[in-house]
Amino acid sequence: MVTFYLWRMSAAAIISNWKKKEFKPVYWLEGDEDYFIDEIVEYAEKKILSASEAEFNQTIFYGKDANWTDIVNACRRYPMFAERQVVLLKEAQQMKDVEKLESYIENPLPSTILVVSYKGKTLDGRLKFSKTIKKKGEVFLSKKMYESQLPGWVNEYLQSNGFQIKPKALHLLIEHIGNDLSRIVNEIDKLSINIGSEKNITEDHIEKFIGISKEYNILNCKML
């Protein structure tokens, strides 16, 4: 099994555990692939709590503007009319003193779920801060996918949404977009709307709805 699927399963495993109401007090999401981090954060924001629970028990901070004391104070609050609360720290890589959260992470409140998004960077595993997070919570490393792994991932994503894609169309899509997973998903989602009830994606669909010229496609095919 290639490394990519291990990464993907790690993201899926976190969400799967949440669906089973199995939570750790801290989740640290880091690395240079935004897609999987965003996937986890979106679930945490929209699915862990019901709408009525989130009204009183969900707090969102953004690293650029966040003060570590405010985050700690929010984490130390007890939930209202719910079993737990969710505290999200997005774009934590923009927070200058994020390591000061260690004082809370060393002794987290069991009823609080702190989810930290630390995009484009990774912590130095030798630091005490990093070791504390690993001891008290869970660290998810999201890496950029290798080019050789993209076809399998795109096929898996399409099949999970009820679509098939012809090999040349798949190559054309990846060649044009590259390994930006968020953009690939956005283009596929847009494509699925435009092709209506059709379930087999062809080169014509890619050319028409993703904006790839026929000249580019002809040149690309000659290079195969």
Residue locations for each model-derived region?
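Conserved beta/loop motifs at nucleotide-recognition and modification sites
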Residues: 2-224
